[in-house]
Amino acid sequence: MSIGIIDYGVGNLGSVKRAIELAGGETSLIKNPLDAEKYGSLILPGVGNYTECYNKLKQNNWVEFFKKTFDSNRWPLLGICVGMHLLMDKGYEGASAENPTPGLGLIKGVVTNLSDQGCNKRLPHVGWNSINISSNGEVPSIFTGIHNNTDFYFVHSYGVVVEKASMISASVDYGIDIVASVSNKNIFGTQFHPEKSSKAGLALYKNFINIS
């Protein structure tokens, strides 16, 4: 079945769509959650401010969909950049310390500024950087055939802190170890942008297509 790219008014949707097609997948933009049944899997992109992205997701009824209807056994899901952030329980970008913005709660974790995680390097973290695939003896399915220390393209000042280390599928060194990818059964997230990551990004998208 085709992959639905969630169009809620943010993200470089055209680039993601073209990359999926180059990787051999069929895909369409999807605005209405009621149309999710037409698709075998979903991609949640995201660029910009976490709180603004969450609010737009909510305005377009996707938060309700993920809270009440979504089943990862039915729809494998890939969150990209801020899309990965939205998988968490809450985030502080664009919100106060006393009143964080909620997330979808699909993966136990929180979104914080990298400086609050101990990063002393210049932010945002922009450019190519090699990832460390933390397979625990088994390569996570979206990294099948992708070698450890492969370079991917990053653009971010915020990152996720997850409750369970077992859900970290890859990390990246930027002064500190930053979560580069998460996975929980059929739910995946990448901090980097596969659509901007040349052949490695296409390989990752092809793996997601094969999961779908």
Name each model-derived stretch.
Residues 92-173:
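Pocket-forming structural segment of enzyme catalytic cores
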